[in-house]
């Protein structure tokens, strides 16, 4: 990166060391202890930037249990970094610290598949992306152009389950920005980078039956399994090339 004779350099070794350290921490979305450790590590790492670093509490989220009752679902804190908030031009950079692998999942360790390929939980999705983001910003801050651009960084803790505890925060930070960049790898099979993603919606449906004797008075019963199977088939039939419907837990 060059600007007016100044160059920002990127230390590949430091990037790799951070990815290995971060990926050694289990950050399944429900692992609050692991997420707390990861958030602290990220806060320390992003403190090298000339801005403020804050851990923001998650918004409350209500989930539905199998019996239809509602309960509060806890989440980890989100990392927010603000650099030059008064700048006329500002952008948003986003990522997530959680992974799909819970604390009791067998995939917990990193392995070098060859001299250039590291396999481990969160290495690609997306602790590697967070390292790319951080070191790109560090290099940018070493250029003369940095003073003319402000930015916010958001690393949320609940992306893998739909970002319900961070959606309002994302919207608030995105307001007024010139652009928003997300550092999760999203390449097509031919290597083409995805430039947009479809939205998602999640719904919980509870089926409640009524018991009856299968031989004596079946007409008085209501079979919740049959009702669920019927709805699943009807929902799946609504799919189009633009809409994917996934009836699953």
Predicted regions and their residues:
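Acidic/His- and Gly-rich active-site-bordering loop/insert found
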Residues: 2-119, 142
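Predominant activation on well-ordered alpha-helical scaffold segments within soluble catalytic domains
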Residues: 20, 43, 131-134, 138, ...
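Buried hydrophobic positions in well-ordered alpha/beta secondary-structure cores of metabolic enzymes
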Residues: 26, 93-96, 133, 153, ...
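Short Gly/Pro-enriched turn/cap motifs at secondary-structure boundaries
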Residues: 69-72, 193-197
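Short glycine-enriched loops at secondary-structure junctions
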Residues: 97-100, 106, 186-187, 197-200
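Glycine/serine-rich anion-binding loops at beta->alpha junctions
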Residues: 98, 116-131, 213
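Acidic/histidine-rich catalytic neighborhood of metal-dependent amide-processing enzymes
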Residues: 126-196, 244-247
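Acidic-enriched catalytic cores of C-N bond-cleaving enzymes acting on peptides and small amides
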Residues: 195, 217-249
